[in-house]
Amino acid sequence: MINNYIDITVRLLENILDNEADYVKEAGAKVAESIENDGVIHLFGCGHSHILTEEVFYRAGGLAAIHPILHEPLMLHEGAAASSVLERKNDYAKTFMAEEDIRPGDIMIVLSTSGRNPVPIDVAEIAREKGAFVIVITSLQYSASQKSRHTSGKRLSDAGDIVIDNGAVKGDAVLKSANFDIAFAPTSTVTGAVILQSIFAEAIETMVNDNFTPPVFISGNVENADAHNQALVDKYNERIPLLGMNL
């Protein structure tokens, strides 16, 4: 099974390289422009999609200007099934997005592989109303195969200024076994991480070419990194309180 899973995942990544690279580069340019003008990069996802927002937060080799919107009832540790119920509620996003410090010139990256549930769609639309540029990572194939749960009939792909397709199949899982009817081994976490890191790599290269020093963390396990990292925490702590919380 390892050969099958890796073969399929590699093909998905090759497809992203062939068909989504221009959108990734465009997204990277927008991220660079935002950071060069004191903007912040917000990320949001429900359920397992939220994992990707934490993957790029306070990350060795990653950008400091990253703000994951971590609304705990929509994560998994306060009730996995309950989070799925909440994700399907129209207008629920208003209960937590009103207080988010999203400003004109910021970037909002919203992740949802199915793209059908109301909360990610509403997050994208509220962020745009606040002046953010919206980047969406979703599966166009998966989304098109399912009816939208949003009252407007929209899917997440309808709410993005840039839409990047992670290529996930319907249901996300790609493997099957004889004598077992349920597909297993999802791919969207792998492809989503690659897409996000590629966007930020493009952004960092753009900033370097613009003679702007990218705000990139060094691993805290490398000697003499602490002062460098603390300076970045101090720079962004007002906009991203999670960076310095409980210090």
From Swiss-Prot:
Top-level taxonomic group: Bacteria
Annotated PROSITE patterns: SIS
HAMAP family named among the record's database cross-references: UPF0309
Protein name: UPF0309 protein Lm4b_02611
SUPFAM superfamilies: SIS domain
Pfam families per the UniProt record, alphabetical: SIS_2 (PF13580)
Residues in SIS domain copies: 31-214
PANTHER family, alphabetized: PHOSPHOHEPTOSE ISOMERASE, SEDOHEPTULOSE 7-PHOSPHATE ISOMERASE / DNAA INITIATOR-ASSOCIATING FACTOR FOR REPLICATION INITIATION
NCBIfam families: PRK02947.1
Coiled-coil intervals, chain numbering: none
